[in-house]
Regions:
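Inter-helical loop and helix-membrane interface segments of multi-pass membrane transporters/permeases
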Residues: 6-80, 84, 90, 122-143, ...
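Membrane-embedded translocation segments of transport machinery
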Residues: 90, 94-310, 316-347, 351-363
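Lipid-exposed faces of alpha-helical membrane segments in multi-pass integral membrane proteins
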Residues: 73-84, 100-106, 110, 183-190, ...
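Alpha-helical transmembrane segments
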Residues: 315-328, 353-359, 379-405, 488
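A generic transmembrane alpha-helix motif of multi-pass inner-membrane proteins
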Residues: 347-349, 359-382, 402-493
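Hydrophobic alpha-helical segments and their helix-loop junctions in multi-pass secondary transporters
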Residues: 3-24, 38-41, 105-128, 195-202, ...
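Hydrophobic, membrane-embedded alpha-helices of multi-pass small-molecule transporters
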Residues: 4, 41, 45-55, 62-87, ...
């Protein structure tokens, strides 16, 4: 429902990537053409393009605003592409997946070669591979890690089950599960190296640019010798100037920024900000920036479409397999209705407050529910269906007995780990207290923290409840119907 809006944003940035210069590389002029836009100057050109030109974001969640027609058209295009890819079911989806899965690797290899040659790339890689052991005690870190692996492997979404339903009975699912897991882990590390090499370049560029501005300001103000100030003696010189010329230093002090490479590396942006702010910040400073921008957002679009094919397959497979629905509607009509309904609901995320609603769905619709779904699946297979029956089925499929390792992991380790993550999630929720969100303040040119309004908290509660209660409610309904049928079938004395 909400994931395809990322593809809409990718389309928007891809279309603007052919402009020279890139529209997020410079701030626009103000209304009087006497200077740059005030909001852009206080923030940055990349933040301004994201929050103002792309989202046209409202100051708070309470101010929904209207639907923005440009993102809405991009969202419509994104759903049209998804519909064309799933039009003929797995026959067309399979061919598209080969392209959407392989092309990003080519782009990542190109970006890896370019990223490792950028100035400051090693700073990003050192930051990536430097462990922070204190984070192991943070429950949210474990929950985020589990959510990420669920998303990347598609666990709990139903897409794997939907695709697996088309396999031959003799398919060696054990071998494929191992291969997919290894490829996923390799891809995550590979993509992280690419990301942090670019991130290191961006942080180093901003750090050195900050040093140049501060050095120029101090050199001009105190008539210092050109080239006297360096990164190694800057703090020492600042201390001397503050003590020797206190009144003069106090005048320029508000304009002296604290330049630190560590702080630049620590100001990590998550989620959509990483894709549409951090990367664009780095791309705009590269040579032939239009080329790198087109490659990046085309890769992002391919990854997004590939993910959407799996998500829609999880919805369409049970609908098309249902005799009641498929007897009245052809497969193309079912696919079209699913895309149309989701596109209509997704228009909420193209409003001025749409990004706030997107964050709500992203944070609360598929976190706790994923843990519960995977836990129920594990318990259902191991303890309801029976581990021995499941082992017998796998032996019939693969021709080999299942190792003790897998049985221990399925029946013992996996449920315990999932329950632990469930406890971590609840403890983090309790420790967080009042739920808050990040809102864009145009007057300051930065994000500010605000409390969720009451109706937003109600929506969050509804999302969590609806996504977690579907399994027990359906189980209860099935149980009641089963007993009603047994009662009707009983002989009358």
């Amino acid at each position: 429902m909400y994931y395809n809006v990322i593809n809409a944003w990718a389309f928007w940035y891809l279309f603007h990537s052919f402009q020279d210069p890139l529209p997020w590389s410079v701030c626009p002029l103000n209304g009087n053409h006497t200077g740059y836009d005030e909001e852009c100057e206080k923030a940055s050109s990349t933040q301004y393009f994201w929050y103002r030109k792309t989202l046209n974001i409202s100051p708070s969640l309470q101010e929904n605003g209207g639907v923005q027609w440009e993102p809405a058209l991009c969202l419509l295009l994104a759903w049209l592409v998804v519909y064309l890819c799933i039009l003929r079911g797995t026959e067309s989806t399979g061919k598209v997946v080969y392209f959407t899965a392989s092309l990003p690797y080519c782009v990542l290899i190109i970006y890896l070669i370019r990223g490792l040659t950028l100035h400051g790339a090693t700073n990003g890689l050192m930051y990536m591979f430097t462990p922070k052991m204190e984070q192991l005690a943070n429950p949210k870190a474990w929950v985020n890690a589990a959510t990420q692996i669920f998303f990347s492997l598609g666990l709990g979404f139903g897409s794997l089950i939907a695709f697996a339903s088309y396999n031959e009975p003799s398919n060696n699912c054990q071998k494929h599960a191992i291969i997919v897991s290894l490829i996923n882990s390799f891809t995550s590390i590979f993509a992280s190296i690419v990301t942090f090499s670019i991130y290191g370049f961006k942080a180093t560029f901003n750090y050195e640019n900050c040093l140049k501005k501060v050095s120029l300001l101090l050199t001009n103000t105190f008539d210092l010798e050109d080239g006297f100030l360096t990164a190694s003696n800057l703090e020492q010189v600042k201390g001397y100037l503050a003590s020797a010329y206190p009144s003069k230093y106090s005048e320029v002090f508000p304009h002296i920024k604290n330049c630190s490479l560590e702080s630049e590396l620590d100001t990590a942006v998550q989620g959509t900000g990483l894709a549409f702010i951090v990367y664009t910040e780095a791309i705009k400073n590269m040579e032939v920036s239009q080329l790198w921008s087109v490659l990046y957002f085309f890769m992002l679009l391919m990854l997004g479409i590939g993910s959407m094919l799996g998500n829609t397959a999880a919805i369409l497979t049970p609908l098309t397999d249902s005799k009641i629905i498929s007897s009245h509607l052809p497969k193309e009509a079912i696919s079209g209705l699913v895309c149309l309904v989701n596109c209509a609901i997704g228009m909420v995320f193209t409003m001025e407050a749409g990004n706030y609603w997107f964050d709500i769905f992203n944070d609360y619709a598929a976190t706790l529910s994923l843990l519960l779904i995977v836990l129920v699946e594990t318990i259902a297979v191991c303890y309801v269906y029976g581990l021995r029956r499941f082992e017998s089925d796998l032996k019939a499929m693969t021709g080999r007995a299942v190792s003790w390792y897998w049985k221990v992991m399925w029946a013992g380790v996996s449920p315990l780990l999932i329950v632990s993550l469930f406890v971590f999630y609840l403890s983090d929720y309790i420790l967080t207290g009042t739920l808050k969100y990040q809102a864009w303040d145009a007057s300051q040119g930065q994000l500010v923290t605000k409390d969720y309004p009451a109706y937003a908290l109600a929506v969050i509660g509804l999302l969590v409840a609806s996504s977690t209660m579907c399994i027990p409610l359906v189980a209860l309904g099935t149980f009641v119907l089963h007993h009603l049928k047994r009662g009707d079938a009983a002989p009358v004395a």
